[in-house]
């Protein structure tokens, strides 16, 4: 699996629709300071589900939308789409048979985000789920920032373990276990409520039966 291209529009400095192709397994983006290289990395993280504006070097999510300049009007929305080559079937589940998988996210000026998988609207969770264990995600080890080495050195043990588990592909199983445990907990809570209702019904039935027995006695 590899990234084939990125399509951006209205995202930070990419005001016009822009398509950046990655024709091989190794590509480089070079240019002077301020030309938008970091914005490309921000775009990848954002479309993969990043929800913290601070991690995208902004104050609010609306900051990722092109804010206008002396010669250009502000954009009303931002859009980023990633196209992945999935010939190796690395992305499994219902998408394993797709040779290409597109992931898209848009945001309006009011901050409302919409996600898409292969042009079908989906939830943020759907995107994070299919990429679990692949090394891709809003804060995965696949996206290495300049400060990453410092962060790793100063990471708490549980934070460092999370990186190692993602690299080893364990995170997908931990997430599934967490979801299963959550479903089991909800099921137990529902069973307890059913048991309480059953007890209440039994009490009411007993009360009604006693009333029924006492009626002939009164007569």
Give residue spans per PLM region.
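Gly/Lys-enriched N-terminal cap/neck module of very large, oligomeric protein machines
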Residues: 2-210, 214
């Amino acid at each position: 699996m590899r990234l084939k291209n990125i399509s951006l529009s209205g995202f930070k400095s990419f005001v016009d629709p822009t398509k950046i192709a990655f024709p091989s397994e190794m590509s480089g983006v070079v240019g002077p300071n301020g030309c938008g290289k970091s914005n490309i990395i921000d775009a990848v993280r954002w479309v993969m589900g990043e929800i913290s504006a601070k991690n995208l070097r902004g104050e609010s999510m609306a900051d990722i939308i092109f804010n206008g300049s002396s010669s250009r009007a502000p954009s009303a929305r931002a859009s980023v789409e990633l196209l992945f080559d999935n010939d190796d079937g690395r992305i499994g589940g219902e998408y394993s048979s797709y040779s290409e998988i597109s992931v898209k996210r848009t945001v309006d000026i009011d901050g409302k985000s919409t996600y898409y998988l292969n042009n079908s609207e989906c939830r943020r969770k759907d995107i994070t789920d299919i990429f679990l264990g692949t090394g891709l995600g809003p804060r995965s080890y696949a996206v290495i920032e300049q400060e990453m080495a410092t962060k790793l050195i100063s990471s708490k043990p549980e934070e460092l373990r999370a990186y190692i588990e993602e690299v080893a592909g364990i995170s997908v199983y931990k997430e599934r276990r967490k979801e299963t445990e959550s479903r089991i907990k909800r099921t137990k809570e529902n069973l307890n409520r059913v048991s309480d209702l059953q007890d209440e019904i039994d009490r009411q039935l007993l009360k009604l039966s006693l009333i029924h027995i006492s009626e002939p006695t009164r007569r």
